[in-house]
Amino acid sequence: MIKLKRGMIIDVNLDPTLGSETGKIRPCVIVTNDVYNERVPVIQVVPVTAWSGKKGRITTNVEIHPSKSNGLSKKSIADCLQTRPIDHRQRLVRIRGKLSSAKMHEIDRALRIVFELNGIGP
């Protein structure tokens, strides 16, 4: 059995979608804690999409530069507003790599804004 960990970047099949949801097979960052990742098939992920100047100005988007450790091949954005649950047994395509602790702190901050946790809001 694959051990998925918080901060991993995995390719996920996000289809089918409805409305403005992010779709296709694309990289996603695992944001659930490792206790859940080990015990339940449904995990929470943040989709990763191609970087653009417009997307880069959105507070809840986190810029990610490609590296050997994260497995990305181009400058990207973690779109924390598009966070969604997936059943990894059905949707996982492959594991790419892992983000640094510093980058995960940026994603955590963006998620706190999205969900208004700890008094941080828009």
Feature locations, PLM:
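Conserved functional hotspots at enzyme active or ligand-binding sites that engage polyanionic ligands
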Residues: 1-122
